[in-house]
Amino acid sequence: MAVHIRLARAGTKKTPFYRIVVADQRSPRGGRFIERLGTYDPRRTEIRLDVPRVRHWISNGAQPTHTVALLLKHPGLAQAAAPADAAK
């Protein structure tokens, strides 16, 4: 089972709000997830993360998506790099 750290959209029409979640890569964007690691509000550029849990999942092989990797660099998680296939 390949596990990704990705954004799950929430909120209403024209007011997006995202949850940063750990999910199986085959599950839909707003579908089931394993664990919620934080939130991202693009309207206020506010990011809230459970940093120890993010590090735990990355050390266990979870791959962050390109967008999440960019968000993880913001609070200073140097270990979180963009996945290799995102350099297209």
Curated annotation (Swiss-Prot):
Top-rank taxon, per record: Bacteria
Parts of the chain that traverse the membrane: none
Gene Ontology molecular function, alphabetical: structural constituent of ribosome
Keyword annotations of the record: Ribonucleoprotein, Ribosomal protein
GO CC annotation terms, alphabetical: cytoplasm; small ribosomal subunit
Keyword check for Ribosomal protein: yes
Gene3D superfamilies assigned to the protein according to its UniProt record, in alphabetical order: 3.30.1320.10
GO biological process, one term: translation
Family under the similarity heading: Belongs to the bacterial ribosomal protein bS16 family.
Listed name of the protein: Small ribosomal subunit protein bS16
Lineage: Bacteria, Pseudomonadati, Myxococcota, Polyangia, Polyangiales
